[in-house]
Structures are given as C-alpha cells and as structure tokens.
C-alpha cells in the first residue's frame, strides 16, 4: 500500500507467495478491492466512465451512468486487452460534492462492479476476472493494482485534473527530473500508412 497525501491518493496491489513445500489450495475469486464509500448527503451517484477501443468513431467516448439504490454497473474489457470496449479509469461522483477517481492497473481482463447500496453509499469491488490458479512451492503472483484518488468540490473535473497531476508526478518516466521526450511516437494498425 502506498499513500500520496499531496494528492489524496492511495494505491495497492495484492501479492501471493507459496512459502510451503506443496502446491497451494486453489486461489480464486480474489477481490483486490471490496470497499463501501459512505457520504453525508443522500441522492443518486453519477458514474463517469469511458468506452474503450473497438475501432469505431466512438472509441474512448465519455459515458454517464446514474446509480440509484439497488443499481450497479459491472465493467470489464473484452478480448483479454485492458482497454478493449471499456477503460480501466472511472469517476464515482457522490451527491455530496465529493468523489473518487478509480484506476485499475492490469494488462488483461480486470473487472469492477460499482453498486449503489443506498442513497448515501456506493460499493466498489474489483479484481482479475476468471482468476483461478494455485502456486507451486516458492512461486509468487500479484493481482491487478487499484488506485483511489479522492476529491472534493462541485466540479468533477477537479478530480480528473488531480488524478492527471498525480500520474505525472508519480507514474511518468523521468530523466533528470523531467518527463522523458521521445523523438517519435507512432503505431501501425488496420493498414495505417508507415512513416
């Protein structure tokens, strides 16, 4: 667990190591997060999330799901890619002018379930979808990571900007204290022209 008080942010990852001499029992249905957030003011929760990529004009478009008590949104990417059809970043906005940006760090199929428990509470569970394994002696694995960036204010973009600054400060590759600038950045797909 790492805390970043300058950004009201916390992140963690779970690790499993078999320190025994035999294989472990089955490891499955791991919830990397299982948290309920409770707020003072009642009302509906706004879940701001984005489509992932599916090779269309609507790639990465913003989505809004309003969660009332009993509602939930189960999110997962498709095709084993971390952002196919669904992005692993979203913002839970409470009726109390507070919220939390959630980021899931995993290169495969993660899941997140956001559930409105009542007019003041929203629950988050997340992890790796279909994780079902065991460990040989001395073998180790890790789970997806979770990052929660808490924000306050009437404008949810304050949370987005705070999270961007956090990523720049703590997760952007730097050389000599400055973000790395590469001479070229490109990708090729679906018949794009080569440079």
Residue ranges and their predicted role:
Residues 116-136:
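Short acidic, Pro/Gly- and aromatic-enriched capping/linker segments at domain boundaries
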Residues 143, 156-195:
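An acidic-aromatic substrate-binding cleft motif
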Residues 103, 113-116, 135, 154-156, ...:
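Short conserved micro-motifs at the rims of enzyme active sites and ligand-binding pockets
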Residues 1-115, 129-131:
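Polysaccharide-binding surfaces and accessory modules of carbohydrate-active proteins
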Residues 28-32, 133, 151-159:
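OB-fold single-stranded nucleic acid-binding module
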Residues 96, 118, 178-180:
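A short, polar/charged loop/turn motif at coil->beta-strand junctions and beta-hairpin connectors
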Residues 35, 107, 148, 187-191:
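Active-site beta-loop-alpha junctions enriched in small/polar residues
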Residues 133-152:
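Short Pro-Gly-centered flexible turn/kink motifs
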């Amino acid at each position: 667990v790492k805390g970043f008080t300058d950004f009201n942010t916390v992140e963690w990852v779970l690790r499993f190591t078999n320190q025994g001499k035999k294989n472990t029992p089955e490891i499955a249905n791991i919830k990397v997060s299982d948290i309920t957030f409770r707020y003072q003011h009642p009302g509906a929760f706004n879940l701001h999330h984005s489509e992932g990529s599916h090779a269309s004009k609507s790639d990465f478009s913003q989505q809004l799901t309003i969660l009332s008590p009993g509602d939930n949104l189960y999110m997962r990417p498709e095709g084993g890619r971390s952002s196919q059809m669904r992005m692993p970043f979203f913002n839970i906005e409470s009726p109390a002018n507070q919220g939390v940006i959630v980021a899931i760090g995993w290169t495969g199929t993660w899941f997140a379930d956001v559930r409105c428990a009542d007019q003041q509470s929203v629950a988050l569970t997340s992890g790796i979808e279909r994780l079902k394994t065991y460990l040989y002696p001395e073998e180790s694995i890790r789970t997806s990571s979770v990052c929660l960036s808490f924000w306050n204010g009437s404008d949810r973009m304050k949370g987005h900007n705070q999270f961007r600054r956090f990523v720049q400060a703590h997760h952007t590759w730097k050389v000599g204290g400055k973000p790395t600038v590469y001479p070229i950045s490109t990708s090729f797909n679906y018949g794009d022209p080569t440079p």
